[in-house]
């Protein structure tokens, strides 16, 4: 249910409830999916929220997605891998003229996000208002319903066009008749654990799109090749090692995605797919760029990322319509000159290869928009790159480049330039002529200064110059009115110039690991600054003018020279995160209560003698770290800590705290409690009130027992009691929880201890004299047990002793574990001087310990 109690996803999309039993009847679900069951928004559109941390190559996808949303078109795939081919306008393409020559490639785009990310979307659900039985646009979504069989009841819905069965356990299509689902055009079977594509697939004659990614399919059946209307076939993340013969039957196929399989070669028959526009073969085991790939006349996008290809064939020049070539993470040592005969290439990804040089013929790439040459062995870039006048993104990081060509100034459309971790000593002035540059990254070089002419790059928004040899803050950057992100970590800057006060538009500033000795007053003029990192400098005080920094949300001052908490910080009323760890703070001022919005506070590795109770006034605090790996140790956690009712994460590790406050249970929001390497011997009973606690770390303490009801912490997922006197946590911790492995371990441990105790009883029974056994009975208070046992006159002594010990164990089982009884028996044997028996028991213990190890 949504937060408001409705059965609707955010954005207005219907939410399906889970089936009670896998494989149960789905007619109710079909009724729920029916447009007649509920009134739904007729203008539902596809929603997407890609991560901001994407490659530059995703920019074109983002803009196309925006256009798509403006048109209210949608995506039929409820979830697909972000590295797969993402459909952008299925509805539009399938409702076109109906011709088999439909140009679906325009509705698809190969997305190059970091591999492994998941793209979550929702099915298109438009045109439902007024839908009747004559409609040919019905969608059924049965994702993650626990289905084990194909839902044959689906045939009750006559006009199913899009069917989604992702994340079930469907293995076959039994029960489907040839006449059923004749109108089905899209079928998605992601994550069903399929070992093969069901042969019944051939019955869906009108199928145009099949997505069977994330299964365990090892081969493509010939029956699939009979689906002549197939436009798009997605089989990513399976175990396919060969392509079948007969591919020529899929003559209308436009998209073939076989990423993350086990293909070692590409058959010549692939060249028969004359309408293929998008081919994804990323992360297979290809060692050769097959010539058959070169004779796909309509191929627009080719992804060979993550293979072991060492060279390109001359025939690559035949790919006249190729616009996007992805060959990152291969073994290319050179580029065949024929590749520079591709007139339409717009994106070329060659990162993480072994290229030593780029041919001057790169000048032929007049349409090139993106060039990624990261992680190669390049020492220079050809001057002719200046002829790539449409280039927008150039990435050269992690090479051995010493300088950029002066003619780079001609790249008037360049928006992003990444030259991190090379061998550059100077930043050429020619960069100042890049009038459209937005992002400039030169981190990890040996640059000593930034030319003043940089001020001419008026559109720059982000500059990164970390870990260079810059001694003076580049004043040219202060004139850039669009600059909002600036990072100068790991340089030798000792002061901030007055010009900095003019950069009022700056939002993010990093200057950690420099030589600053004061918090410059010029920084106080940055009234829009939200993030400031001054860690690992030599700052001792904070000026009062910091109160002018009204937008500051994150302030990092760790590893400086503060000997007292600067009261001036307490004027930052919008501060959310403060890190002032690794200093020499001894106390916290009362004024800290003025930080009304503080959420995260790191005070670790200072020299507090007592826990600063002033912190307990922070009603909005969610994370507190006051751990100590060096210096003075805290010995007490005050009861006032319970006042921080919003606290979610508390870290008091590496101190000398002995007791946890009795009212700790009042921290009802606590999710993680880190208290390793202290001197804690027990937890108070109120600890059981921490109902949302998920992580508990009590390593290296003096814990001898845990509250018996700790199993009531139903949210607990991670526990660590290593290096405590506990033999093991009590069984109650794990019973009924999701820690089945621990439960099994504890059960086996109990069984093992029981067997060891029985062996010890046998040793005692077969070794002790009758006189000594009488003494042993007295020490163990078991005389009554032995005397009340029915013993036959002929029963051997060792049998009588063994039965007496078993009876004693039965009486004590409720109170003591097998291990405790063993220790109790061992002490009693020592009292009566039965040293020979003790030696035998010790030998047994050593033997069992060795076996366990």
UniProtKB/Swiss-Prot annotation:
Region (Disordered): 1-78
Residue ranges constituting the Death domain according to the UniProt record: 757-845
PROSITE patterns: LRR
Entry keywords, A to Z: Leucine-rich repeat, Repeat
InterPro entries: DD_LRRD1, Leu-rich_rpt, Leu-rich_rpt_typical-subtyp, LRR_dom_sf, LRR_domain-containing, LRR_R13L4/SHOC2-like
Compositionally biased spans, kind Polar residues: 56-65
Mapped LRR repeat ranges: 133-157, 159-180, 183-204, 206-227, 229-251, 252-274, 275-297, 298-319, 321-342, 344-365, 367-388, 390-411, 413-435, 436-457, 459-481, 482-503, 505-527, 528-549, 551-573, 574-596, 597-618, 620-641, 646-668, 669-690, 692-713, 715-736
Annotated Acidic residues bias: 19-31
Keyword field contains Repeat: yes
PANTHER family for this protein: PTHR48051, RAS SUPPRESSOR PROTEIN 1
Protein name, as recorded: Leucine-rich repeat and death domain-containing protein 1
Primary gene name: Lrrd1
């Amino acid at each position: 249910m949504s937060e408001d109690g409705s059965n609707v996803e955010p954005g207005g999309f219907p939410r399906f409830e889970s089936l009670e039993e896998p494989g149960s009847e789905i007619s109710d679900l079909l009724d729920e999916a029916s447009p007649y069951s509920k009134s739904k928004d007729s203008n539902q559109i596809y929603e997407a929220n890609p991560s901001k941390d994407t490659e530059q190559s995703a920019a074109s996808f983002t803009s196309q997605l925006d256009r798509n949303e403006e048109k209210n078109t949608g995506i039929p795939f409820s979830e697909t891998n972000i590295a797969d081919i993402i459909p952008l306008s299925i509805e539009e393409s399938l409702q076109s003229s109906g011709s088999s020559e439909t140009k679906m490639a325009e509705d698809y785009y190969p997305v190059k996000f970091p591999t492994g990310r998941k793209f979550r979307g929702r099915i298109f659900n438009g045109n439902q208002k007024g839908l009747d039985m004559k409609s040919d646009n019905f969608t059924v979504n049965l994702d993650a319903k626990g289905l084990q069989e194909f839902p044959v009841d689906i045939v009750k819905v006559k006009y199913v066009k899009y069917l989604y069965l992702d994340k079930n356990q469907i293995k076959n299509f039994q029960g489907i008749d040839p006449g059923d689902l004749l109108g089905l055009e899209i079928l998605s079977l992601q994550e069903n654990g399929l070992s093969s594509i069901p042969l019944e697939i051939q019955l869906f004659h009108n199928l145009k799109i099949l997505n069977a990614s994330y299964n365990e399919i090892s081969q493509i059946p010939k029956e699939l090749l009979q689906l002549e209307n197939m436009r798009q076939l997605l089989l990513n993340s399976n175990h396919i090692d060969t392509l079948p013969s007969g591919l020529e039957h899929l003559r209308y196929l436009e998209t073939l995605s076989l990423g993350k399989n086990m293909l070692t070669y590409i058959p010549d028959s692939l060249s028969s797919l004359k309408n293929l526009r998008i081919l994804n073969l990323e992360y297979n085991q290809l060692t050769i760029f097959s010539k058959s790939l070169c004779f796909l006349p309509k191929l627009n996008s080719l992804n060979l990322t993550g293979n072991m290809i060492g060279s390109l064939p001359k025939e690559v020049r035949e790919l006249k319509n190729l616009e996007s070539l992805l060959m990152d993470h291969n073994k290319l040592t050179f580029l065949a000159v024929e590749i520079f005969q591709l007139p339409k290439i717009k994106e070329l990804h060659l990162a993480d290869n072994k290229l030593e040089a780029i041919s001057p013929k790169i000048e032929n790439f007049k349409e090139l928009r993106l060039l990624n040459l990261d992680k190669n062995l390049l020492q220079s870039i050809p001057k002719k790159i200046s002829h790539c006048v449409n280039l927008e993104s150039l990435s050269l990081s992690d090479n051995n480049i010493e300088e950029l060509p002066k003619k780079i100034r001609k790249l008037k459309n360049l928006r992003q330039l990444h030259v991190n971790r090379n061998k550059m000593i100077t930043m050429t002035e020619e960069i100042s002529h890049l009038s459209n540059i937005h992002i400039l990254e030169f981190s990890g070089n040996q640059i000593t200064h930034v030319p003043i002419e940089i001020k001419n790059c008026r559109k720059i928004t982000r500059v990164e110059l970390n870990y260079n040899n810059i001694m003076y803050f580049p004043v040219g950057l202060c004139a850039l009115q669009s600059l909002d992100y600036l990072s100068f970590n790991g340089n030798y800057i000792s002061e901030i110039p007055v010009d900095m006060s003019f950069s009022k538009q700056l939002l993010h500033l990093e200057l950690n690991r420099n030589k600053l000795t004061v918090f410059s007053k010029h920084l106080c003029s940055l009234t829009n600054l939200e993030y400031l990192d001054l860690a690992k400098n030599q700052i001792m005080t904070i000026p009062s003018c910091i109160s002018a920094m009204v937008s500051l949300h994150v302030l990092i001052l760790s590893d400086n020279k503060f000997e007292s908490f600067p009261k001036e910080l307490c004027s930052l009323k919008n501060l959310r995160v403060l890190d002032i760890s690794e200093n020499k703070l001894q106390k916290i001022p009362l004024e800290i209560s003025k930080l009304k919005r503080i959420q995260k506070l790191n005070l670790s590795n200072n020299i507090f003698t007592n826990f600063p109770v002033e912190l307990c006034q922070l009603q909005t605090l969610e994370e507190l770290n006051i751990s100590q790996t060096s210096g003075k140790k805290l010995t007490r956690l005050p009861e006032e800590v319970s006042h921080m009712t919003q606290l979610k994460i508390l870290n008091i590790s590496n101190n000398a705290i002995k007791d946890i406050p009795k009212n700790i249970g009042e921290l009802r929001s606590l999710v993680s409690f880190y208290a390793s390497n202290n001197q804690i011997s027990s937890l108070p009973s109120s600890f059981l009130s921490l109902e949302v606690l998920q992580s508990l770390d009590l390593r290296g303490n003096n814990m001898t027992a845990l509250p018996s009801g700790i199993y009531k912490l139903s949210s607990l997922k991670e526990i660590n009691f290593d290096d405590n006197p506990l033999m093991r946590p009590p069984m109650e911790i794990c019973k009924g929880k999701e820690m089945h492995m621990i439960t099994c371990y504890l059960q086996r441990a109990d069984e093992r201890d029981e067997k060891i105790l029985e062996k010890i009883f046998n040793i005692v029974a077969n070794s002790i004299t009758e006189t000594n056994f009488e003494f042993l009975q007295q020490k163990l208070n078991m005389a009554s047990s032995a005397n009340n046992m029915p013993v036959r006159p002929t029963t051997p002594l060792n049998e009588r002793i063994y039965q007496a010990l078993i009876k004693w164990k039965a009486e004590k089982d409720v109170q003591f574990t097998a291990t405790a009884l063993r220790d109790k028996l061992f002490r009693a044997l020592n009292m009566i001087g039965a040293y020979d028996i003790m030696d035998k028991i010790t030998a047994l213990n050593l033997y069992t310990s060795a076996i366990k190890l």
